Every structure is written in C-alpha cells, then in structure tokens.
C-alpha cells in the first residue's frame, strides 16, 4: 500500500513573519530573496516548514533528504529513494504532501475570479454540464472542486499546467472523484470545507493510505 502524507494550515495574520523565517534553512532563505510580495514570502516560508515537518515525521531517522530543482524548475526531493513531494499555497492556505509515488496537491479558497470563463476554456463538456447543474450560489465551490483536481493531477504527472488542464476530465457524480478515461494509474483524494477545497493525486495503481492533518499555524 502506498503511503501519502499531507499537512495543511490556514494562516493566522496575527503571527509575525519572523516566526516562520527563523526556521528556514540557508537554501530556503537564499531562494526567498527572489520574492517581493509579503504574502508570497509568508506562504513560501510556511510551505517549507510544513514540508520539514512531514519529512521529519514520515521518513526513516537516518534519512538525509535534500530539496532540488529539476530542469523544468519543479521542486523535487533528493537524498532519499522512492519519495515524492508537492506543495500548494494561496488565499492564506498552505499544503505540503509527501508520497511514495509521484504526487500533486492543490488547496484553494474562495477568491474573485472569472471562473465561468476558465471553465469554458479548460473543462470538458461533461464537466461543464455538471457545473451547470449546480445551484448558482454553489457555482464557485463546484468550480474549485474540479479545478483543484486538475491542478493536483497535472502536478502528479509532472506536466505543465497550461498545456494539460484541458486534456483530462473528472467525474464528480459519485461519492468519490474519478478521472474519466484511463484512470487506473491515478488515485485521488478530495476534502471539501466551507471555506476551501483540497485535492491530492498519486500516480499509482495500488491502494493509497492517506494521512491528512490540519496543523494550527501557531504550532508550525
């Protein structure tokens, strides 16, 4: 059985940024110098600390994991065999994922966007029909349910978002989300809350043991 570990948090703006910066590695602090947006700096720091927590609690004690960038710029785990990572942040929400197979995670909260136009461009006919059947007030969250699945799946496949969003579709008519077509190689998990949606994907044909935990920001 494949193990998949997820930690996520909702930011607390009352907590000072320095609280999170103090726990970063020298490499993280060096990468952080490229950011100017305060909210981006904050979410970057929190995502790296969540990942640190996952690595420390889930990997063998003797493991010496390191982060590296692939040729495409994707963040990857080095120094340990058979483990994969994914990060997501936005709208004050941050999530980190560690899995024994290629993985992707996305967490999204409500925000102003032209979601109908995005759906018309990236959603399949079946997805658009399902979206149209939802109550008007439920439209934004229904959109996020599909969008987060697409983002998580594309990340798990290691492909570019823009070029592959429209090439995959999902069925949300059942109890659990399913990828339409050839879906045997991907396991999906989605959690829907009043103020956000979290979706995760793992590239495997085996059953997945999901470990999902919300960590209060003041415990990071």
What spans do the regions from the language model cover?
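Core catalytic alpha/beta fold that binds nucleotide/phospho-ligands
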Residues: 1-220
């Amino acid at each position: 059985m494949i193990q998949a570990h997820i930690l996520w948090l909702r930011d607390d703006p009352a907590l000072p940024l320095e609280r999170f910066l103090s726990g970063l590695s020298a490499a993280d602090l060096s990468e952080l110098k490229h950011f100017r947006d305060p909210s981006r700096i904050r979410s970057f720091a929190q995502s790296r600390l969540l990942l640190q927590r996952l690595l420390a609690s889930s990997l063998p004690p003797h493991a010496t994991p390191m982060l590296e960038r692939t040729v495409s710029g994707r963040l990857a785990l080095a120094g340990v065999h058979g483990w994969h990572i994914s990060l997501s942040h936005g709208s004050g929400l941050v999530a980190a994922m560690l899995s024994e197979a290629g993985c992707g995670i996305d967490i999204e909260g409500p925000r102003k966007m032209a979601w109908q136009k995005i759906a018309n461009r990236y959603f399949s006919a079946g997805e658009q029909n399902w979206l149209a059947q939802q109550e008007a007030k439920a439209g934004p969250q229904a959109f996020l349910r599909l969008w987060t699945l697409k983002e998580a799946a594309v990340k798990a496949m290691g492909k570019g978002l823009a070029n592959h969003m429209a090439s995959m579709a999902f069925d949300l008519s059942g109890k659990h989300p399913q990828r339409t077509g050839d879906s045997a190689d991907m396991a999906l998990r989605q959690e829907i809350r009043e103020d956000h949606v979290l979706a995760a994907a793992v590239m495997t044909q085996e059953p997945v043991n999901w470990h999902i935990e919300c960590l209060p920001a003041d415990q990071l």
